[in-house]
Curated annotation (Swiss-Prot):
This is Large ribosomal subunit protein uL11. Binds directly to 26S ribosomal RNA. GO terms for molecular function: large ribosomal subunit rRNA binding; structural constituent of ribosome. Belongs to the universal ribosomal protein uL11 family. It comes from Caenorhabditis elegans.
Length: 165
């Protein structure tokens, strides 16, 4: 028999979900059911919390204490980039593996890098900016009309100055 569940204990559960949609409660049930929470209610709360990430895949962090769930959205670099492109949300069921062809500025990339900084493995902000540029390359967008890899090279050569913090 497993030990009795301690209500004051803080449990953290990470979930991948699509913003603004109530995910499959069948996926939530095994994660939150044993903690004494209703998967349906959690699903609705997640949909509410991820409203401004409509149609994008984001990671949600559920912090559960005393049978109350607090939901934080932990966006990936890719979803931050796609959100900054300000493209209209697409129908996920019809359009698959979409290539984004927007254009971002270096300042926007630095802004995204600052958001991602705590989770980055880089020593300096410059390294985090390069990580974000690599993701931008995968997403398929351009930076100031240039390919992201050209920007990475010009940062490495010192042509583009990245602030220390």
């Amino acid at each position: 028999m497993p030990p009795k569940f301690d209500p004051t204990e803080i449990k953290i559960v990470y979930l991948r979900c699509v913003g603004g949609e109530v995910g499959a409660t069948s996926a939530l049930a095994p994660k939150v059911g044993p903690l004494g929470l209703s998967p349906k209610k959690i699903g609705e709360d997640i949909a509410k919390a991820t409203q401004d990430w409509k149609g994008l895949k984001v990671t949600c962090k559920l912090t559960i204490q005393n049978r109350v769930a607090k939901i934080d959205v932990v966006p990936s670099a890719a979803s931050l980039i796609v959100k900054e492109l300000k493209e209209p949300p697409r129908d996920r069921k019809k359009v698959k593996n979409v290539k984004h062809n927007g254009d971002l500025t270096v300042d926007t990339i630095i802004k995204i890098a600052r958001i991602m900084r705590p989770r980055s493995m880089a020593k300096k902000l410059e390294g985090t900016v390069k990580e974000i540029l690599g993701t931008a390359q995968s997403v398929g967008c351009t930076i100031d009309g240039q390919h992201p890899h050209d920007i990475i090279e010009s940062i490495a050569n010192g042509e583009i100055e990245i602030p220390a913090q």
